[in-house]
């Protein structure tokens, strides 16, 4: 089990967890030293979201990198996918983002990309962790790294998207966008302006403390309300670092990451093409059944966009994502990208010329009940054997009417209990039964 890294980088409450100035400096120094060992380019890219702690954590990271002799290019406040994009474009050894994504402002963290724009694999994360626990290393002969700021860093990313989709996007509807007071603030607006979109922007005034507060992709009620008030045709909601996207149709009804994947699958020619879709263990069974009925290959990965990416590469597919709104298109990028996904959707809606609600999967989705059970410590997968017989009992009762998923959180001591069934009360009753068993045997 990893010591510092979770399923999406390193994350925690600032000053009261791993996320301290001291640790962040050591992380920068460890990665810098590893870059030297492997003879990678002595150059990295950094960015951040809008949290009040982002500045001092970034400079702690930079000091550790500079001490190891690594040059740093600072993009400032930009969405996470922009850092991945620029890391590849500028041939940097690595890319860092100071962000805690959809978490509250008191949390922060570090996402780390390798030179190919992918998140680090488990083996490389272990190497970094070993280096963190070693000595702090100064580059000999005072050959320390430099620090530079790149103004208007978003421009290269916007131009890349525009050159690919200008011929497809001609959307005439009214759009409301929720930037979660995060990294998409002003950046997403610049992208929409480039395409001439008629939009109203909400939650786009970050003050360092309001990121994700009552807004963004994890608080969809905000965009639903705004779409109705504005009589808009579409709502687009991003999270704090803009790697997630949830949309809302003209009736204020949510379309989550699974629904977005289904839209992209129907119009994959506009999105560069794909010979299959990767979802996750959380993907609603209704979508899996729909893909099979339409002869679209479908694979379930573990939850986490890094695992979606691994299976995209493994099976040679191009499009995948999660219910939570991480959507990856390998025809363009290497990580979940809310801004690029939004433009893909606007291209599709422009070409198809029908209401957004008509793109949704027809019929009722399977009903899901998800309960997060707090634990006293992180649970390992082998610990789940203690409730294996209880899970088996529920699966027998469900038969072919549903399924069960128990999943430890990758970032906190929580076990997620999910039951899916064709009836909501059945799903809820069986989920509550399993929660009681978990509390008896694991808490």
Swiss-Prot record:
The keyword Metal-binding applies. InterPro entries: A-D-PHexomutase_a/b/a-I, A-D-PHexomutase_a/b/a-I/II/III, A-D-PHexomutase_a/b/a-II, A-D-PHexomutase_a/b/a-III, A-D-PHexomutase_C, A-D-PHexomutase_C_sf, Alpha-D-phosphohexomutase_SF, GlmM_bact. One of its GO terms (cellular component) is cytosol. Mg(2+) binds at residues 101, 239, 241, 243. It holds the Pfam family PGM_PMM_II. The modification Phosphoserine is found at residue 101. This is Phosphoglucosamine mutase. It comes from Francisella tularensis subsp. tularensis (strain SCHU S4 / Schu 4). The lineage of its organism: Bacteria, Pseudomonadati, Pseudomonadota, Gammaproteobacteria, Thiotrichales.
């Amino acid at each position: 089990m990893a010591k510092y890294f979770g399923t999406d980088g390193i994350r925690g409450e600032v000053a009261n967890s791993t996320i301290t100035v001291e640790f962040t400096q050591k992380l920068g120094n460890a990665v810098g030293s590893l870059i030297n060992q492997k003879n990678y380019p002595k150059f990295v890219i950094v960015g951040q979201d809008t949290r009040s702690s982002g500045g001092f954590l970034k400079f702690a990271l930079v000091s550790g990198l500079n001490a190891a002799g690594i040059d740093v290019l600072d993009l400032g406040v930009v969405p996470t996918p922009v850092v991945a994009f620029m890391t590849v474009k500028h041939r940097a050894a690595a890319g860092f983002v100071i962000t805690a994504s959809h978490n509250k402002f008191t949390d922060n963290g570090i996402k780390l990309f390798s030179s190919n724009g992918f998140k680090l694999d488990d083996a490389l994360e272990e190497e970094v962790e070993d280096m963190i626990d070693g000595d702090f290393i100064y580059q000999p002969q005072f050959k320390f790294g430099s620090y530079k700021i790149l103004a208007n860093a978003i421009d290269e990313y916007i131009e890349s998207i525009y050159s690919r989709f200008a011929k497809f996007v001609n959307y005439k509807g009214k759009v409301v966008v929720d930037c979660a007071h995060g990294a998409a603030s002003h950046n997403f607006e610049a992208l929409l302006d480039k395409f001439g979109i008629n939009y109203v922007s909400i939650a786009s005034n970050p003050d360092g403390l309001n990121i994700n507060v009552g807004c963004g992709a994890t608080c969809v009620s905000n965009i639903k309300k705004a779409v109705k008030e504005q009589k808009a045709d579409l709502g687009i909601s991003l999270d704090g670092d803009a790697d997630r996207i949830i949309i809302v149709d003209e009736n204020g009804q949510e379309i989550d990451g699974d629904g977005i994947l289904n839209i992209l699958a129907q119009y994959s020619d506009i999105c560069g093409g794909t010979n299959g879709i990767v979802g996750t263990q959380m993907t609603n069974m209704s979508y899996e059944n729909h893909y099979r009925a339409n002869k679209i290959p479908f694979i379930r990965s573990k939850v986490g966009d890094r695992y979606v990416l691994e299976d995209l590469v493994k099976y040679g597919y191009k499009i995948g994502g999660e219910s939570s709104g991480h959507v990856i298109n390998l025809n363009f990028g290497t990580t979940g990208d809310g801004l690029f996904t939004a433009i893909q959707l606007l291209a599709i809606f422009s070409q198809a010329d029908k209401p957004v609600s008509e793109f949704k999967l027809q019929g009722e989705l399977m009903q899901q009940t998800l309960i997060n059970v707090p634990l006293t410590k992180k649970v390992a997968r082998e610990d789940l054997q203690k409730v294996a017989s209880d899970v088996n009992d529920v699966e027998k009762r469900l038969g072919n009417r549903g399924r069960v998923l128990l999943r430890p959180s990758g970032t906190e001591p929580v076990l997620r209990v999910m039951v899916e069934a064709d009836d909501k009360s059945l799903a809820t009753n069986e989920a509550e039964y399993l929660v009681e068993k978990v509390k008896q045997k694991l808490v």
